Amino acid sequence: MNSNFTRAEIKAQAKEQLRGKVWMFFLVNVIVYAILIPISFLTEMENAASIIGLIAMYVVTPPLSLGMIMVYLDVTYGDPVEISTLFKGFKMLGKSIALFLWMLLFILLWSCLFIIPGIIKSYSYSMAWYILAENPDMTAREALTESKIIMNGHKLDFFVLQLSFFWWAMLIIVTLGIAAIYVSPYQQLTFTNFYHNIKRQPAPVAEEVYAEPVYTEPVADVIE
């Protein structure tokens, strides 16, 4: 892995951070599902309720996702974790929805060329949620641009890191989902540590093959 820490070290760090917090994350997930499941039921209806449910899903899911990222960031920083952090994403409602829609749009557009460019773009933008959570003054487009910068040269690293959870995913299936109580936060903390790891590194000199022809805002001095 072309980074300061190996995959094994990043995952070991995540396990240590998760120690004593498994049930806290379980509670956070229960709250999230308690909000999203009723909304998903609305989308299955065949009347106006389905439209309301669909709108609610697109309005509620992005800020909740951002709030979850904030919870994981707090844990990796060693900060006290509060359930209320889960709802801090709603303070950035507009930006979280904008980030979700821009990501969806760009990935769909690149997927129209071929599937592979769309997959590559999804990895380019995969750190945007973390960036927006840590930089609330950024716009959604700026977070996407910053994600492209720090993921340049690290997309394969992230893919391999995700692949390293294959057997954990099998364990979830074998245990009928019970193992997810541990595996899910362990995986997400690992990905959060990956973000911390690559954001400290200078961007590689090589340019990406694909780039949007729009948005020309300068990218100097954006890497910590």
Task: Kindly give the residue locations of the regions a language model identified.
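Hydrophobic alpha-helical membrane segments
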Residues: 1-224
